[in-house]
Amino acid sequence: VGRITNLTSPRYIHFVSDEKAYVTQIWDNRIFIVNPKRYEITGYIECPDMTAESGSTEQMVQYGKYVFVNCWSYQNRILKIDTETDRVVGQLTVGIQPASLAMDRNNKLWTVTDGGYEGSPYGYEAPSLYRIDAETFSVEKQFRFRKGDSPSEMQLNGTRDTLYWIDRDVWRM
């Protein structure tokens, strides 16, 4: 049994290789780089335009040498990280609080936003589902929900050709 300590508030882990993984955090403006074989932190990736108090990175998916990360709480961006340099090389603005991230079999990224909440200092809007081209890192389509809807837990099926999410019921697209 091994353990990696001194992380702020770890959320998700993505394995780049057997000896390198990224660990996202909430309430930290860094993504930690760890060596899972040696149980140690080897570095971190600074997330632009975030403070430690407003930092929030969540789920990760990989396309070629790039890892995409959704920035959730009080954020509205998807980050693109070059795994060879461990640096953020792109940012894409989406709606308030992208809560889930997935990549389908056609190399399209999908993210669903929760829209924040009424009275939030960051804002409150209708949530949206976004389809993003991983190659060009641009939004191809936005599907808007109603204000007050709460889409979450977006997932793809096993063949990665059908999208599911929860919003009071289980939805399929």
Language-model segment annotations:
Residues 1-173:
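Predominantly soluble domains enriched in secretory-pathway, periplasmic, or organellar proteins
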